[in-house]
Amino acid sequence: MSRRATVKAPRAGAAARRGAVARRTKETDVAVELRLEPGEAAISTGLPFFDHMLDQISRHGGMALTVRAKGDLQVDAHHTVEDVGIGLGEALRQALEDKAGLARYGHAVVPLDEALVEAVVDLSGRPHLTFNAKLPSGKKFIGGYDVDLTQDFLQALVNHARICVHVNVRYGRNLHHVVEAIFKATARALRAATAREGTALPSTKGTL
């Protein structure tokens, strides 16, 4: 399929740790802006539950986040969810710059009532996703959102941010709780990994 993405460079004199991406294809039109510091979230994808999950990334990830997406939802939500993941990943990669002074690693275990999810992040520069999530059987959709798209979203994010993420769903009965805990745990782990710890690059290779 034809794809075209435009990456916006930060404005002259703009503060670091921010990224902005505009991406338009025959299937979607996506714009993402983020800043790696606490701030407001403005999310609109046409998928209310997905909007709610992206808001969790903003709040628990400690980042100001704007996402505007229009997609061919009459066909399926997959294109929209995946392309938002691509845009978010590219914007995050911009915001991380050369990664000097960052913690690099982040780990979080997040409960939501009966559900418990663990997420681990490494800003390694090598895309990888391990997604161990045996979701509760039966219900597959939450407010029109196909929960299987959660893995597709994370894979797109990982690939384009060039980071390593491990997600382990330890247990959970309520599907909404499990999926929300996945987003919250990933956000908390990202927040820890992107925290500043000094000026040195956290790698013996000299690059990430």
UniProtKB/Swiss-Prot annotation:
Enzyme category, top tier: lyase
UniProt keyword DNA damage present: no
Pfam families assigned: IGPD (PF00475)
Pathway it works in: Amino-acid biosynthesis; L-histidine biosynthesis; L-histidine from 5-phospho-alpha-D-ribose 1-diphosphate: step 6/9
An example Gene Ontology molecular-function term: imidazoleglycerol-phosphate dehydratase activity
CDD domains assigned: IGPD
Region annotated Disordered, chain positions: 1-20
Key words, A-Z: Amino-acid biosynthesis, Cytoplasm, Histidine biosynthesis, Lyase
EC number, as in UniProt: 4.2.1.19
Ranges of Low complexity composition bias in the record: 7-19
Annotated compartments: Cytoplasm
Catalytic reaction list: D-erythro-1-(imidazol-4-yl)glycerol 3-phosphate = 3-(imidazol-4-yl)-2-oxopropyl phosphate + H2O
GO biological process, one term: L-histidine biosynthetic process
Domain of life of the native organism: Bacteria
Record InterPro entries: IGPD_sf (IPR038494), ImidazoleglycerolP_deHydtase (IPR000807), ImidazoleglycerP_deHydtase_CS (IPR020565), Ribosomal_Su5_D2-typ_SF (IPR020568)
Gene Ontology CC: cytoplasm
HAMAP family hit by this protein: HisB (MF_00076)
Record-stated family: Belongs to the imidazoleglycerol-phosphate dehydratase family.
Stated name of the protein: Imidazoleglycerol-phosphate dehydratase
Organism of derivation: Anaeromyxobacter sp. (strain K)
